[in-house]
Amino acid sequence: MNANSIFLCFFIMLIGCTLTHSCPSGCYCDQVDGNKCRPEEGTNPHLCLGKYCKTPDSSSVITGNQDEKTQAKG
């Protein structure tokens, strides 16, 4: 594999991650601010910049039961 195909594979993986409902590692889902990904403390803000998250059920408002900010990120 040359560097281009490795980069392309990584890029496709990045695109795939943005289409899912979760933010990149080190970012959390800010549902109050339009489902934008926000950096956790100590995370490079550019990692989360321009990324959005979709809640599993976007028609219902989540009230503390499933707050993504409190869940531990692997």
From Swiss-Prot:
Top-level division of the source organism's lineage: Eukaryota
Signal peptide: 1-22
GO CC annotation terms, alphabetical: extracellular region
Keyword Secreted appears in the UniProt entry: yes
Tissue specificity statement from the Swiss-Prot or TrEMBL entry: Expressed by the venom gland.
Chain segments annotated as coiled-coil in the UniProt record: none
Keyword Zinc-finger applies: no
Main localization (coarse): secreted
Family membership: Belongs to the scoloptoxin-09 family.
Name of the protein in its database record: U-scoloptoxin(09)-Sm3a
